[in-house]
Amino acid sequence: MATAHKIVLHSLHGYRPELDAIVAQWIREQVKYVGVVGVDASRIEDIIDELCIGDGSSPYFMVTAFHDLSESVQDAIFLAEQLSGELAGDVQVVEF
């Protein structure tokens, strides 16, 4: 199953090193947007940004956003659905 170009990452436990491989896969699949909601959402968003930049020799542009604890998964999905133009398309929710 192909990954959607927009992801809402629902963090259940905070950052874990396994996220690095997931983000690498999203880059290969040309995911354009990741919204993070849940535990450590801000930290996870920063880590995703760092992974996209890498060593700077071949950065990948991905729009990221985090949602604080007052926002739900449904709020994150709603925001992702509003994105248009190059960011239009289906939203996939990934629990991590």
Feature-to-residue mapping (PLM):
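ATP-dependent carboxylate-amine ligase
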Residues: 1-96
